[in-house]
Amino acid sequence: MSNKDIFVKISGSKKIREAREKVKSDTLYNLTSAVERLKSASYVKFDPTLEIVMKLGIDPRHSDQIVRGVVNLPAGTGKIIRVAVICKEEREEEAKSAGADLVGSINIIDEIKSGQINFDVCIATPDMMSMISSVARILGPKGLMPNPKLGTVTLDIKNAIKNAKSGQVEYRAEKAGIIHAGLGKLSFSDQDLLKNLNAFIGAVIKAKPVGLKGSYLKAIYLSSTMGASVQIDLTSI
């Protein structure tokens, strides 16, 4: 995928054309300027999400070049996150008290099998993974399968729920080494958006595969939902 393919083209209505005029596709921006530009170019009536696309110099088809992890965004995501906890009965009250929206075991598994997935994050205790394996093919493609590397298979239910609710974002490089994530609402203060951006970009940089040859960080683009897209000057990171 070329940089040109990644860049979001804006055309059509008058509002979109006006927004397009406020950003230049051939200009590189630092993070501060990029956030300012995207805010000034936003025209939608709802509160759009600040989105990031990172192109990495990796080949995810190779097991030693998989880039994946989670980031706790300092300012949160601005979204209401519904958390399901699959655990044994003796820990259900603990999960409920910690803020879980859906708690149980076989009842949740049955709902998943019937197509009822009313949660954004699924947390499980290790002793429930054999049961959850029966719905792995359903949860996996949706990015909802509990994973110890992501902190969603754990004995520390309380902390896992807290992280999920407070703005924990999962990232994973897909085909062509592309990572995409939402990092907060455009209504956030510039300072909060920059905190989230720096935390996310920093985490991805730290996740660079050991021994990778060549350039790791190829390009970064920021955009808002249905809005403009700007390319980041990598030398400013």
Swiss-Prot record:
The keyword Repressor is assigned to this record: yes
Name listed for the protein in its UniProt record: Large ribosomal subunit protein uL1
Physiological role: Binds directly to 23S rRNA. The L1 stalk is quite mobile in the ribosome, and is involved in E site tRNA release.
Domain of life: Bacteria
UniProt KW keywords: Repressor, Ribonucleoprotein, Ribosomal protein, RNA-binding, rRNA-binding, Translation regulation, tRNA-binding
Gene from which the chain derives: rplA
Subunit structure: Part of the 50S ribosomal subunit.
Record family assignment: Belongs to the universal ribosomal protein uL1 family.
Pfam families, sorted: Ribosomal_L1 (PF00687)
The keyword Ribosomal protein belongs to this UniProt entry's keyword annotation: yes
Naturally occurring in which organism (per UniProt): Rickettsia typhi (strain ATCC VR-144 / Wilmington)
GO CC term (a single one): large ribosomal subunit
InterPro entries the UniProt entry points to: Ribosom_uL1_bac-type, Ribosomal_uL1, Ribosomal_uL1-like, Ribosomal_uL1/biogenesis, Ribosomal_uL1_3-a/b-sand, Ribosomal_uL1_CS
Entry's Gene Ontology BP terms: regulation of translation; translation
GO MF assignments: rRNA binding; structural constituent of ribosome; tRNA binding
